[in-house]
């Protein structure tokens, strides 16, 4: 019942059940509990029996302190891999193409508010390309931190009331579903 209702919510159903504003506490407890209560209520209706509880079954082994940072990390990692990195690759490719097309064209360099020494336009473009390539490398390097998910630590980071190995199981499933190396 939980999976069915979550898939329906993911597909845009029941959005009227989520009236909370974006501005709330840092941990997102209001949104997390709202989601747990909605999933529990709708799941019980779907199952035609009262088997789900917002805390004990829907929110089992989780905390807003886990779920919100983990959700943000998942979203950021997906957006970086699916959108940002391909766009940076396209930008690098286009600048490289411009470098080749403008090989041999001389222009005046600028420093502060005055003319400086001459340089090839392709040299100037290669500087822009290099900055983007370095920025891309730094973004890729920083992903190792984004791939770290806060799962199973529960409310204060001790993992109390969370089954042993829960974090590993959850990150493995998330990695399989997203095709990203979460840990």
Question: What are these regions, as identified by a protein language model?
Answer:
Residues 1-183:
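Conserved, well-structured ligand/cofactor-binding cores
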């Amino acid at each position: 019942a939980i999976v069915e209702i979550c898939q329906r919510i993911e597909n845009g159903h029941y959005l009227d059940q989520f009236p909370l504003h974006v501005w709330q506490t840092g941990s997102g407890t209001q949104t997390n509990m709202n989601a747990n209560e909605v999933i529990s209520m709708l799941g019980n209706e779907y199952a035609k029996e009262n088997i789900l509880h917002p805390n004990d079954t829907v929110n089992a082994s989780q905390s807003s302190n886990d779920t919100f940072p983990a959700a943000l990390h998942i979203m950021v990692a997906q957006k970086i891999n699916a959108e940002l990195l391909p766009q940076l690759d396209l930008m690098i490719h286009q600048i490289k193409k411009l470098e080749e097309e403008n090989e041999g064209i001389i222009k005046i360099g600028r420093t502060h508010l005055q003319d400086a020494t001459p340089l090839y336009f392709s040299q100037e473009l290669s500087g822009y390309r290099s900055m983007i390539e370095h920025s891309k490398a730094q973004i890729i390097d920083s992903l190792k931190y984004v791939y770290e998910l806060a799962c199973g630590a529960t409310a204060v980071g001790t993992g109390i009331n969370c089954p042993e190995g829960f974090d590993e199981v959850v990150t493995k499933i998330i990695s399989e579903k997203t095709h990203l190396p979460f840990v």
